[in-house]
């Protein structure tokens, strides 16, 4: 008898579940996407113990016909594609036919569904085996409950994280879906506590306000562009609103949230020199294109895609963002205190894929274990020792409450997140309607950011503080200017132009400068000698592992020539292959910093006036090349309020 055998369907589904159903968040993602594909306009998501105990999804979509219910749980059974041509024209979120059988194979699942023109179907499946199938009275749509996830795969269950982490993963997914489909009303509950409610009115800015806060929504810049192949719409924050992680950038392709590093990189490039190192914007970009231009069949989770015209898309994103910022005066308002900004950022840190932290008023709420101060960050020791969820030991019983629509489900009393049990609010709750109406009004009242050019307004100097900061004024109020950052921007644009020129005016060194390298570094540099001449490095071989420099461009900062050569060489030997564009950029930034006024350097009034006038001639007078702000603004109103002239 041969050793190779065909696996049965149940074992195949268990193997597939290892890729498709990684954690509770995977289940939520797949089921909610199915609801959206079924033309749902409202979706409820109910969780217990971060989905490890129970996940319930209720929608008002098309429902599943009785004859399709069993087939839907067979592997590679789908209504979304018919032949290989459909695979290259996919508009739906799902298409592989793997999610439902994979989820059913590692859980205890109950399905109640109806198409609205016939009796509904009630189906119970445990570990991939059908336990019960019957007709039932049901409204149009689908109500699916997944309980005791991974009950038959203890190895997978063992590696589930804490309640907070798993809940954070789920909220991350739901937030992205809410942004992708603002036309769908989404409601997320955890142990009967509401975490998110979107109106479904199609206004993505309102969804962003629900997730990030109304304060962030006020700092959003609308982005819109179109080419022959792509249409881009979305919002990105002003450079003054940043976070320490890329997790706040969301990219949507044909209605599907995707994780694509090059798209995020393109967004960052659109902010070129506007962001400090290690800081990232909050952004949402929705990209529409012909399905033939994108391959979504890359990974079972469908989070990764490949583009056939990637470079054209990246260029369009970069140019669109850069064009938008050129229309705006990017002067940060000093009216928001540091404490307020720190608080707001601590709120936004909840939106990280691996962490879920306590709630601030503007964010969906996640309740801490009893006894923990809500205003304190969860200590690392607490995170590491947090109790892991344990599956219930009693025999599973299908909840009868799911059979009849009018009966409400009861939350588990064994949650490690202790909270009082409260009655679940109905969809027509007056309180919820009021909250959404209030948010809608706030979003509508947001003043659009003025796009009347980014020219720096005339500034009239009135003094200098500590030899570092310049004070100036105009009819808009008071401005504080960092003199080093201001001249750094001026010098950067000068050196950027010089480094980019092919023909270099050179000056001989009195004494040739010798550079000693290791053999590996020497060989790496030797390959790039012609390229390095383009950035002003004129190297001649001197011995087996050395180079000498006899001349340098005339525009090198005086007295710092050898130091600049050393730093440029350091950049070169770090790289396996020299990126001339990047090296030019780094060289211009480095030289602009070294050639600029330093702190504690006092200037005359004429020097200050000349500096401000020269700053106005730059293409971006608002940030230094490292992304730090050059000036901040105190409006006259803020000053009057500070001195209690207005209340």
From Swiss-Prot:
Residues 387-396 have a biased composition (Low complexity). SUPFAM superfamilies: ATPase domain of HSP90 chaperone/DNA topoisomerase II/histidine kinase, DNA mismatch repair protein MutL, Ribosomal protein S5 domain 2-like. Signal peptide: none annotated. The keyword DNA repair applies. PROSITE patterns: DNA_MISMATCH_REPAIR_1. Residues 377-396 are annotated as: Disordered. GO terms for biological process: mismatch repair. The keyword DNA repair applies. Belongs to the DNA mismatch repair MutL/HexB family. This is DNA mismatch repair protein MutL. It comes from Bacillus cereus (strain AH187).
């Amino acid at each position: 008898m041969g050793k190779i055998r065909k696996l049965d369907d149940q074992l195949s589904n268990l193997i597939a579940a290892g890729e498709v159903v990684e954690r509770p968040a995977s289940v939520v993602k797949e089921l909610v996407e199915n609801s959206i594909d079924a033309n749902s306009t409202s979706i409820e998501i109910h969780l217990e113990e971060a989905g490890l105990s129970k996940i319930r999804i209720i929608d008002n979509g098309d429902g599943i016909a009785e004859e399709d219910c069993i087939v839907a749980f067979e592997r590679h059974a789908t209504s979304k594609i018919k032949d290989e041509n459909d695979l290259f024209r996919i508009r739906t979120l799902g298409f592989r036919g793997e999610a439902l059988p994979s989820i059913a194979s590692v859980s205890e699942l109950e399905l109640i569904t109806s198409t609205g023109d016939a009796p509904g179907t009630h189906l119970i499946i445990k570990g991939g085996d059908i336990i019960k199938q019957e007709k039932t009275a049901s409204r149009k749509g689908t109500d699916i409950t997944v309980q005791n996830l991974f009950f038959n795969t203890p190895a997978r269950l063992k590696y589930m994280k804490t309640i907070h982490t798993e809940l954070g993963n789920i909220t991350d997914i739901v937030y992205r879906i809410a942004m992708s489909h603002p036309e769908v009303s989404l409601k997320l509950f955890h142990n009967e506590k509401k975490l998110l409610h979107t109106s479904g009115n199609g206004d993505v800015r309102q969804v962003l306000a629900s997730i990030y806060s109304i304060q962030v929504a006020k700092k959003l810049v609308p982005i819109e562009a179109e080419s022959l192949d792509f249409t881009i719409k979305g919002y990105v924050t002003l450079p003054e609103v940043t976070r320490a992680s890329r997790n706040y950038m969301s990219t949507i392709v044909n209605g599907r949230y995707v994780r694509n590093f090059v798209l995020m990189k393109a967004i960052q490039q659109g902010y070129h020199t506007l962001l400090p190192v290690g800081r990232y914007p909050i952004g949402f970009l929705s990209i529409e294109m012909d399905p033939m231009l994108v391959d979504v069949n890359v990974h079972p989770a469908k989070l990764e895609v490949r583009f056939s015209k990637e470079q054209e898309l990246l260029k369009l994103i970069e140019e669109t963002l850069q064009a938008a910022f050129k229309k705006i005066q990017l002067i940060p308002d000093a009216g928001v205190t540091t404490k307020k900004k720190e608080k707001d950022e601590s709120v936004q840190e909840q939106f990280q894929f691996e962490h879920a932290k306590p709630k601030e008023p503007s964010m969906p709420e996640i309740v801490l274990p009893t006894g923990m101060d809500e205003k304190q960050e969860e200590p690392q020791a607490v995170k590491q020792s947090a109790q892991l969820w344990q599956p219930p030991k009693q025999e599973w019983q299908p909840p009868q409450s799911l059979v009849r629509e009018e009966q409400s489900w009861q939350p588990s009393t064994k949650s490690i997140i202790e909270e009082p049990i409260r009655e679940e609010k109905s969809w027509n709750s007056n309180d919820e309607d009021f909250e959404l109406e209030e948010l809608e009004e706030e979003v509508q009242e947001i003043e659009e950011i003025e796009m009347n050019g980014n020219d720096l307004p005339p500034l009239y100097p009135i003094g200098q503080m500590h030899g570092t900061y310049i004070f100036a004024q105009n009819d808009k109020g008071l401005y504080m200017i960092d003199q080093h950052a201001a001249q750094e921007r001026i010098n950067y644009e000068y050196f950027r132009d010089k480094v980019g020129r092919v023909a270099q005016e050179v000056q001989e060194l009195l004494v040739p400068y010798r550079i000693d390298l290791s053999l590996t570094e020497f060989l790496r540099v030797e390959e790039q000698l012609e390229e390095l001449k383009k950035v002003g490095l004129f190297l001649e071989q001197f011995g087996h592992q050395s180079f000498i420099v006899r001349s340098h461009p005339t525009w090198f900062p005086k007295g710092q020539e050898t130091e600049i050569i050393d730093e440029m060489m350091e950049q070169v030997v770090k790289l396996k292959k020299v990126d001339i564009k990047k090296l030019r950029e780094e060289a211009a930034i480095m030289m602009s910093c070294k050639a600029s006024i330093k702190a504690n350097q006092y200037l005359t009034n004429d020097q200050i006036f000349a500096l401000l006038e020269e700053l106005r001639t730059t293409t971006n007078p608002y940030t230094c090349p490292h992304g730090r702000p050059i000036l901040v603004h105190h409006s006259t109103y803020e000053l009057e309020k500070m001195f209690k002239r207005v209340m």
